[in-house]
Amino acid sequence: MKVLITGGAGFIGSHIAEYYHTSANVVVLDNLRTGCSNNLTGLNVEFINASILDRDAVSAAMRGVDYVFHMAAMVSVPESVEQPDLCHEINVEGLNTVLNIAAESGAKKLCFASSAAVYGDEPTIPKRESMKPQPMTPYATSKLDGENHCEEFANNGHIDTACLRFFNVFGPRQNPNSAYAAAVPIFMHRAMNSQPITLHGDGEQTRDFVYVKDVVRAMAFAATQNKVQGVYNLGYGKRTSIKSLAQSIIQLADSTSHMVHEDERVGDIKHSLASPEKLFSAGFTPAFTLESGLKETMESL
């Protein structure tokens, strides 16, 4: 078996590479715009330093590939607002390049990393795949466009596709120093250094956190199960407040950190929760929980 991971030097992509590198031939295509080659240290993979917009490079990477995991993207919401045209070029045109070449080369399936951001700030929870998307940013719009392109290719018989809408993914190799870093790596970094942990607003915002290794397992499941086609939520279906997340991390780190409150951030969604029943009913079962994932992440630092 041969797999191609676009964006495979990134946080989630590198975990897919780690999952497959002993059981499959793994090709990673990444221009290291936000990915890091150190994420692939010790992994038996073929690395191609190139953009998904480079048709020749994508064609070379695609030779003999059975399954494509399309992780490459502009992943920062604020950056997408600052540079919407570049976001569209990378996230939509880049995906189209990969889809076309995957179809031409005879790849069996493409699994696309979509996002819960497509739901927007409509307050109804849990989020179900049948709900009308309401993207609020160029990033979210690009992910919805990507889903539509995947569906179009599948409906026309060019290549099977599955799109997984990631909720709040966390785990090892998530960068706490990024300008757009997620809560878990920031909280862990500060807790391990006994620094204050900042909560925006009252900290009662809730999220559906999902461990990266279950994200990888779900992507692998989607790739190899013929019946898994279309769009699926990927979360645990569990609500966790940002305040309780911080408390759990402080306790795990045996830290003296305390929480401080700042003003709410404009545009922040108050509550986000997946309905994962569609994916679960297809046969996927998580192997981790928020608690076990946090513990393993902490131990990796």
PLM feature spans:
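N-terminal Rossmann-like NAD(P)+-binding domain of SDR-like oxidoreductases, especially those catalyzing
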Residues: M1-V169, K213
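Short amphipathic alpha-helical interface segments enriched in basic and hydrophobic/aromatic residues
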Residues: S37, H70-A73, M188, M192, ...
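Short, electropositive, low-hydrophobicity segments enriched in small/polar residues
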Residues: F11-A17, N39, D54, V77, ...
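NAD(P)-dependent short-chain dehydrogenase/reductase
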Residues: T124-I125, M136, N148-D208, V212-A223, ...
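C-terminal substrate-binding subdomain of Rossmann-fold SDR/epimerase-dehydratase oxidoreductases
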Residues: A191-L301
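Short glycine-rich loop/turn motifs that provide flexible caps or phosphate-binding loops at active sites
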Residues: T6-A9, T34, A72, E93, ...
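Short, solvent-exposed loop/helix junctions and linker helices
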Residues: T6, E89-V92, A140, N177, ...
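Residues that form or immediately flank small-molecule/cofactor binding pockets and catalytic motifs
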Residues: I52, K132, G171, E204, ...
